[in-house]
């Protein structure tokens, strides 16, 4: 019997039976209930009935293919030769055989834990990059699994392609920075929450996975977790009448609170141990980003790369980066809004609860994160990855509805527009990625040439590398690669405890008084024309 005949008679094909079994395993109730729900949802939705059978034929193969394509793109387009820069050097040195670099108030411990299996064994940057790329693909796949259920698998995979196709996701996934992982944790957590709310019941495994996703996100970026899952808590309380779902809401809220307690609790404990308490740590975090000043446009200006600041004196682009790409970003935003309506129609159609609120949950959480990162004076493109990951779900919902709801020529036109949207993303975002990676490679070569110059000058452990108040941008990474300690703006030699001292200053600047008569060496030509003052007689 052909697939279409089985489909028309309501019988599940083997990939769908596997999907139904997986749903039943992660939620309460027998497998037959999951299969019946999948079948009834398909019959009830005319758009789903109209979907092409071959799109359903792959089943879980769609998310697997999307994650594999993302991982392959990382290996093809991200260079393994890019060295560790400032932030990466700090994270890589924490759980390793290396001298730990100074820990800042703005950082969280999740990322050093993630890469500990590599950093404990080797200092190879190539090994670290390969590990991060593979883990990034696995993380994207696991996050997509959380959204399987009433959405066809190809729609979930499409969301993964939309997010994974962004230049910032491809670049950051290969770097030792936390925002990509915060996006993965937030995406998985919101998906698990919505799936339980949509089904009206939870399971022990589902609650445990939700708590794990919240904990993971909070360990990566506590602020992201508080915003995303704080909003999810509010939605959990208001989306269903308490008289009908008290146990469900209690279980989900308990998982979220437990996850936040573990992840944010670690941050609070560390605040008391090393930073004088949470309030002082928050103040130090604000200072690290240049302060706080609300600006809702700055992040939009750098969606396609660059740096921007709300205050004079900090590096900032003029105007908008890559203005022609604004048309695609605008289409992305419009699709995300349409996706709220689409999800209400074919995912959250049950009138027993506030389907509009659940359909809008990804957009609400995305807007919350965007508002959070509209406050720092120095904004960075990478901070918004949780925003794009959540909006990708709504955009994929919109595309599904647009290509299945209409008939005849309208459907053909909708499919063509959807293909153009995805193709335009992959093409234009790759161009931005290539330009950004070229800049990082150039900076990386300059940094490593300067490190080699210092090595030839006899800089060896035990040593300390410091800078004047005008810090050279590669001071800390140089300390990492040379096996030295790093001290910001050392004021006297007693801080070195007898170790060799190297002072790096920008060209034309003067070092601290204790180093003014040391031999000055102009290092490899890089931004700022740095000069190194190396202590002799050691």
Descriptions of predicted regions:
Residues 250-331:
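Membrane-lumen/periplasm interface segments of specific transmembrane helices
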Residues 66-70, 159, 163, 214, ...:
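Transmembrane alpha-helix segments characteristic
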Residues 312-356:
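Hydrophobic, aromatic-rich transmembrane alpha-helices
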Residues 193, 414-477, 481, 485-486, ...:
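Membrane-embedded, lumen/periplasm-facing catalytic core of multi-pass transferases
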């Amino acid at each position: 019997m052909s697939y279409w005949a089985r489909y028309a008679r309501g019988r599940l094909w083997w990939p769908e039976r596997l999907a139904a079994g997986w749903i039943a395993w992660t939620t309460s109730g027998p497998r037959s209930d999951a299969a019946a729900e999948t079948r009834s949802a398909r019959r009830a939705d005319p758009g789903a009935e109209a979907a092409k059978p071959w799109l359903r034929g792959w089943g879980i193969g769609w998310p697997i293919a999307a994650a594999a394509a993302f991982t392959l793109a990382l290996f093809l387009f991200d260079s393994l030769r890019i060295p560790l820069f400032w932030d990466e050097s700090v994270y890589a040195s924490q759980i390793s055989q290396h001298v730990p670099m100074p820990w800042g108030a703005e950082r969280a411990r999740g990322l050093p834990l993630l890469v500990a299996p590599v950093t404990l064994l080797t200092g190879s940057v190539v090994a670290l990059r390969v590990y991060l790329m593979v883990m990034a693909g696995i993380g994207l796949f696991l996050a997509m699994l959380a959204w399987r259920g009433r959405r066809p698998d190809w729609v979930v995979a499409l969301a993964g392609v939309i997010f994974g196709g962004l230049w910032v996701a491809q670049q950051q996934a290969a770097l030792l920075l936390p925002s990509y992982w915060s996006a993965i944790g937030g995406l998985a957590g919101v998906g698990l929450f919505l799936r339980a709310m949509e089904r009206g019941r939870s399971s022990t495994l589902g609650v445990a996975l939700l708590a794990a996703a919240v904990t993971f996100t909070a360990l990566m970026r506590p602020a992201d977790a508080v915003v995303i899952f704080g909003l999810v808590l509010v939605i959990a309380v208001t989306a269903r009448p308490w008289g009908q779902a008290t146990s469900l809401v209690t279980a989900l809220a308990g998982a979220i609170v437990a996850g936040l307690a573990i992840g944010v609790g670690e941050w609070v404990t560390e605040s008391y141990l090393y930073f004088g308490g949470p309030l002082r740590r928050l103040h130090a975090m604000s200072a690290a980003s240049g302060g706080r000043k609300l600006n809702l446009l700055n992040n939009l200006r750098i969606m396609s790369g660059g740096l921007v600041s709300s205050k004079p004196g900090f590096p900032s682009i003029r105007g908008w980066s890559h203005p022609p790409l604004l048309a695609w970003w605008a289409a992305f935003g419009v699709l995300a809004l349409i996706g709220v309506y689409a999800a209400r129609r074919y995912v959250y159609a049950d009138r027993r609860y506030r389907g509009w609120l659940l359909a809008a949950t990804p957009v609400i959480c995305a807007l919350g994160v965007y508002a959070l990162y509209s406050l720092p004076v120095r904004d960075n493109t990478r901070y918004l990855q949780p925003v794009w990951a959540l909006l990708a779900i709504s955009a994929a919902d919109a595309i599904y509805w647009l290509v299945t709801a209409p008939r005849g020529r309208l459907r053909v036109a909708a499919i063509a527009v959807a293909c153009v949207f995805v193709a335009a993303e992959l093409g234009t975002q790759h161009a931005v990625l290539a330009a950004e990676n070229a800049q990082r490679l150039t900076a990386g070569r300059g940094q490593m040439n300067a490190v080699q110059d210092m090595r030839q000058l006899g800089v060896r452990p035990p040593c300390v590398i410091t800078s004047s108040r005008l810090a050279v941008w590669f001071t800390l990474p140089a300390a990492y690669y040379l096996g030295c300690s790093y001290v910001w703006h050392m004021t006297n030699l007693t801080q070195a405890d007898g170790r060799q001292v190297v002072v790096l200053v920008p060209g034309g600047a003067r070092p601290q008084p204790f180093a003014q008569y040391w031999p000055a060496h102009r290092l490899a030509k890089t931004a700022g024309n740095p000069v190194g003052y190396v202590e002799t007689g050691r």
